[in-house]
């Protein structure tokens, strides 16, 4: 039985529609296992970014976990590190996987994603090796990059077929 569900609308009339299904438990967010044993866990803001990054890397060599969203203060607000709260999904996963040695942080490359990445790194750096792996383009996430790669490949195929 499903323990966690996230809703997202595609036709939003200019406003994003995102919500969790009532009764969802964030300890059980979207998780992709590796094909072989792995000591690395990659964490993402959402399931779509988890799948997009897997598509871009073309390898299932590590655990991949969606955090079910992140918290970050609004840009420009003064914040204290104490406002950071560990992700229930990440805490639940790590408590059941003592073999994990590395956390690869793959949040979005926007203010919220960078803020979350910095605070996740600080929170876990004493227990795990931390790898920051944000998308190289400012303002992007891995779904944006996967879409861009797909569109480039489709354009090349159309060009090749029109010759």
Segments and roles (model prediction):
Residues 55-163:
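TOPRIM fold recognition
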């Amino acid at each position: 039985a499903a323990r966690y569900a996230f809703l997202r609308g595609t036709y939003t009339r200019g406003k994003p529609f995102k919500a969790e299904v009532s009764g969802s438990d964030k300890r059980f967010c979207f998780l992709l296992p590796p094909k072989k044993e792995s000591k690395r866990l990659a964490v993402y803001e959402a399931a779509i970014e988890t799948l997009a990054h897997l598509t871009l890397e073309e390898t299932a060599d590590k655990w991949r976990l969606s955090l079910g969203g992140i918290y970050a203060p609004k840009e420009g607000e003064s914040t204290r590190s104490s406002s950071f709260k560990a992700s229930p999904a990440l805490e639940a996963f790590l408590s059941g996987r003592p073999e994990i040695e590395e956390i690869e942080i793959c949040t979005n490359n926007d203010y919220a994603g960078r803020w979350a990445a910095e605070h996740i790194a600080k929170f876990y750096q004493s227990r795990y090796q931390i790898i920051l792996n944000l998308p190289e383009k400012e303002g992007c996430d891995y779904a944006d990059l996967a879409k861009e790669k797909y569109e480039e490949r489709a354009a090349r195929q159309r060009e090749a077929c029109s010759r």
